[in-house]
Amino acid sequence: MTTKYDDASWHSGGEGYPPEAGPEAGATHIGMFLAWAVLAGHASPELEEDSEDELAALRERTVTPGAFVHDSCDGKLVDHDLDDVGTAFASAYYAGDDEDEGDAGLYLEDYVDAVSPGDGEPEDVYRVPDTWETYELVAPLIDARFAQWDDEGRPAVLRHRA
């Protein structure tokens, strides 16, 4: 059974999505996470085999993270794209507690914090540019959460530090 963590169509087809953003904008935040996983060595052997050329372009930064997800992964982040460690981390950090709708993963919260201006107003996640500059804002937060997750014994759900 495949676990789907996110799908750009859930966003682009959802209420409040800016139609002028185009369907690709729903993949940007997904792409930032998957690019981090790939660059951190957590791509699955299947993804490596099926998307060899596309992954080379991602690693060379000739394709943006959101475009990679949109074009190569059909806009989806699924467990089969990640190795075992990447899957466990995505479950804990990206998905959170599936049993409790109020306990979503911390990733989107961190993403909004990373891309928002310092004026206290959160950025509309669908208007964030799909660029490597955006990735450079987001990746350090994912690195920190991965370190936290690892330090805490790789729990099933990652929560804010007490």
Predicted regions and their residues:
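N-terminal domain-onset segments
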Residues: 1, 154-162
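N-terminal low-complexity, intrinsically disordered segments
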Residues: 1-68, 72, 77, 81
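Polar/charged low-complexity regulatory segments
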Residues: 4-19, 120, 127-154
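Alpha-helical repeat scaffolds in large eukaryotic proteins
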Residues: 35-38, 116, 143-146
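Short, surface-exposed, charged/polar-biased interaction segments
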Residues: 54-55, 90, 159
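Amphipathic protein-protein interaction modules
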Residues: 60-137
